[in-house]
Amino acid sequence: ISSASAYHKPVCDFRITEGTTLANKYWEYSRNKIACEVVLMKAYRESGFPVTIIRPSHTFCEREAPVGVNGSKGSWQVLKRMLEGKPIIVHGDGSSLWTMTWNEDFAKGFIGLLGNPQAIGEVFQIMSDESLTWNQIYKSIADALGVPFKPYYVSSDFIIATQPEGYDMLGNLIGDKANTVVFDCSKLKRAVPGFQAVVRYEEGVRKCL
């Protein structure tokens, strides 16, 4: 399992396919994923090691409602502020596009590639076709909680400049979530006929809450 964060940042084209260049100077996590891909594909080319590389994007489940920026206590800290009627930090102006994928939808694509001869030596993206702005993402959470969405917009650069010790907002934002991305999963759908992510984010987040 690799990561969609491994794709080139800043993005050259917001439309992302498996052929998009890999390079992320902002996030060590992503560079480590790229290095692992290189090792595995080398083993496939030189010794026939059967490898399939998966690049997911922000897969989530009922255990945690995913957000862009949170404190040491995770996303529940953000939800607590919402319930208290307080504003929440939204990076940038909240207009960049992002993709969230419900874990059961990811699993359908993943299982469809297991033992699939079309998958050997290949790379696949597994994620939802739904693209949402961060404003829409946070508003979905607020709606699920039954409270108003009160954004407090802060530039990613300022968040990075003032981050507490132990945080890596440069990687998390500039290297990942602050970029507008739209993923093309047509390759996966050719290899796994019938694959379709069916759980929309607003439905998934209600399962979390």
Protein language model regions, located:
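Mid/C-terminal beta-alpha module of Rossmann-like enzyme folds, strongest
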Residues: 112-173, 185-186, 190-191, 206-209
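SDR active-site strand-loop-helix element
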Residues: 1-4, 54-56
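Glycine/small-residue-rich pyrophosphate-binding loop that anchors the diphosphate of NDP-sugar donors
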Residues: 97, 177-180
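Conserved catalytic-site region of short-chain dehydrogenase/reductase
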Residues: 4-14, 28, 59-63
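Substrate-positioning beta->alpha
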Residues: 70-78, 91-114, 121-122, 136, ...
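Residue-level signal for the nucleotide or nucleotide-sugar donor/cofactor binding architecture
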Residues: 31, 101, 132, 183, ...
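Active-site Tyr-X1-5-Lys
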Residues: 24-53, 62
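NAD(P)-dependent short-chain dehydrogenase/reductase
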Residues: 46-97, 141
